[in-house]
Curated annotation (Swiss-Prot):
Family: Belongs to the class-I DAHP synthase family.
Functional summary from the UniProt entry: Stereospecific condensation of phosphoenolpyruvate (PEP) and D-erythrose-4-phosphate (E4P) giving rise to 3-deoxy-D-arabino-heptulosonate-7-phosphate (DAHP).
Protein name: Phospho-2-dehydro-3-deoxyheptonate aldolase, Trp-sensitive
Catalytic reaction list: D-erythrose 4-phosphate + phosphoenolpyruvate + H2O = 7-phospho-2-dehydro-3-deoxy-D-arabino-heptonate + phosphate
Keywords of this entry: Amino-acid biosynthesis, Aromatic amino acid biosynthesis, Transferase
Organism this protein belongs to: Escherichia coli (strain K12)
Domain of life: Bacteria
Amino acid sequence: MNRTDELRTARIESLVTPAELALRYPVTPGVATHVTDSRRRIEKILNGEDKRLLVIIGPCSIHDLTAAMEYATRLQSLRNQYQSRLEIVMRTYFEKPRTVVGWKGLISDPDLNGSYRVNHGLELARKLLLQVNELGVPTATEFLDMVTGQFIADLISWGAIGARTTESQIHREMASALSCPVGFKNGTDGNTRIAVDAIRAARASHMFLSPDKNGQMTIYQTSGNPYGHIIMRGGKKPNYHADDIAAACDTLHEFDLPEHLVVDFSHGNCQKQHRRQLEVCEDICQQIRNGSTAIAGIMAESFLREGTQKIVGSQPLTYGQSITDPCLGWEDTERLVEKLASAVDTRF
C-alpha cells in the first residue's frame, strides 16, 4: 500500500516533556513569589491603578547566556535605581518569527549552525529564565506556538503575541490561557483593529487542543485573560505619535476596553533604524509630560553593544551584540531609562 502521510518529514526526534524539564530546573518558592508579584504589578499598571511605566527592554533575541546574564545584572541595578517610577522587565526572546527564513532562535537552534538541538535549546532557555528571575528581574517573551510555551510560561511575567500572529485564532486562544498579561502587536501593515479584536477574543473562554505538561494531547478550556492590551509597533509608517495613540484609545473605548497600551520603540516605529528608538523615546516622554495616561508601557531593543552582526560559519561572534535586529548599546540604554523615569515623575 502506498504511504500517504509524512512524505516530507526528514527527521523525527523525541522531545523532553515540560514536566521532565521542570523537574531538572524547578521553580523555587522565591522565584514563584517573584513571578507572581511582578505579574500583579504589571496588571496594576495596565489597569491604570499604578502610575508607573512598564519598561520591557532587552536584546532582540537571546543567543549567548553569559552576555544575557551580564545584561540582566546591569538591568537589575537600573530596576533598583528607578523602581519608584518604572517597572523594568527584561526582554528574553527565544523564538524568532521570520518573514521568510533565518535563525529561528535559541530554542530551535542553540548552536547557531542549523543542527536544531531543540532539547538543549529548551534547557538553556529554562535555565536562563530561572537565573534572571533569581536576580530579581522579571522576564518577558513572545509566545510563538502552542508547544514551547509549556516549557517556560511559569517563569514569564509578561508575554507578547507578534505582529504576524495577532490575527491567528490559535494564538488568541493560547493568550486566553496564559497566566501572565499579554500584549498583542498591531499588524505588520500598521492595522491596530486586529490587535483590539485579539484582546476581545482573548478575554473570552475558549477550547483548544494542546499537549499538557506530560506531553499528552489534551483538551483545554480556558477562563479568558483580562489583561490583554495593544502594542503599538508601527507598520508601513510609525504609529507612536499622540494622534495614533488617541485613535487606538478610541477603538478600545468603543469596545469598553481599558484605554492603556504599550508603545514599541523599535520595529516599524523606528523604521528599522535602531538609533531612532531614542527619537521615539523623546516623543513618548513629551506625551507623558503632557499628561498622557494611555501610555502604560514601552518596549525597546538594547544589548551590551550597539548594532547587530551576522553569523558567518565558525567565525567568533562579538560579545554582547545582537545577531538579529540591531539594538541600542548599554550607554544609550541607561540614558533612555533615565529619560523615561524623569518623564514619569510628572505623574506623581
